[in-house]
A protein has these predicted regions:
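Class I (Rossmann-like) S-adenosyl-L-methionine-dependent methyltransferase catalytic domain
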Residues: 1-34, 43-91, 115-118, 132-208
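Class I SAM-dependent methyltransferase core
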Residues: 39
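A short acidic, Gly/Pro-enriched loop at the edge of an enzyme's catalytic core
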Residues: 90-102
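Flexible loop residues that form catalytic
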Residues: 97, 107, 191
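A short SAM/SAH-binding and catalytic strip from SAM-dependent methyltransferases
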Residues: 101-115
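A short glycine-rich, Lys/Arg-flanked "PGG" loop and its adjoining helix->strand segment in the class I
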Residues: 117-129
């Protein structure tokens, strides 16, 4: 994961403020009495820190040592605690049904389709009954769709810029419904923002086991 170690040294890839998606999920998690949460692909820890501040038992996992070192330093600076592990989201080192919630912000789509399917299988395995999973996905409607080297259907690799060599997989609601077919509840929402002629489109998934 040399690419991610390099990318996550950039300040613009290591923000400290939490994702709005995670902030907005908190009331639902509190209502459910959620306690143990996994930040999947935690990066530099912006959501790990926020969840720890909110009093949750937080676990963070990432493939990048650089990311985990940054997260650890930020936790220590704020005198917060979280269990951090270097690992692969396709083979989570956790027992069955051990998390009340799992979040995955700006991470799950950096894989091939079959790898995403394996990741979702691992998420389902490690979530407790009634547990919640939150993630965002690239939408096929995005202006970025089709840019870079095509590695498979709907998956492209950046050729230039800070994410050179990084995969981006794009989906639509139909694909996500198939992906989450084993979950009891599936809520999908499209969020779009257009600047000049560029459309930023993503799908927010909140699903319950």
């Amino acid at each position: 994961m040399t690419e991610w170690n390099h990318i996550l040294k950039r300040k613009d890839y290591a923000p400290e403020e939490p994702s709005r998606l995670v902030v907005n999920l908190i009331p639902a998690l509190e209502k459910k009495g959620a306690k143990r949460i996994l930040d999947l692909g935690c990066g530099a820890g912006r959501n790990t820190l926020y969840l720890a501040e909110k009093g949750f038992e937080v676990h963070g996992i990432d493939v990048s040592e650089t990311a985990l070192k940054t997260t650890k330093k930020r936790l220590e600076k704020r005198k917060l605690k979280a269990e951090l592990v270097k690992g692969d989201m396709k083979a989570l080192p956790y027992s069955n049904s051990c998390f009340d919630a799992i979040i995955c912000i700006n991470a799950i789509y950096h894989q091939r389709r079959m790898q995403i399917e394996k990741t979702v299988s691992e998420i389902f395995r490690t979530l407790r009954k009634g547990g919640v999973f939150l993630a965002n996905f690239h939408s096929k409607r995005s202006s970025r769709y089709g840019k870079g080297i095509k590695v498979e259907e709907d998956t492209f690799m950046d050729e230039f810029g800070p994410e050179k060599g990084i995969l981006h997989h794009y989906v639509d609601k139909e694909e996500l419904r198939k992906l989450f077919k084993d979950f009891e509840k599936v809520n999908l929402k499209i969020e779009e923002e257009k600047v000049d002629n560029y459309l930023r489109s993503r799908i927010i998934a909140v699903v319950e086991k």
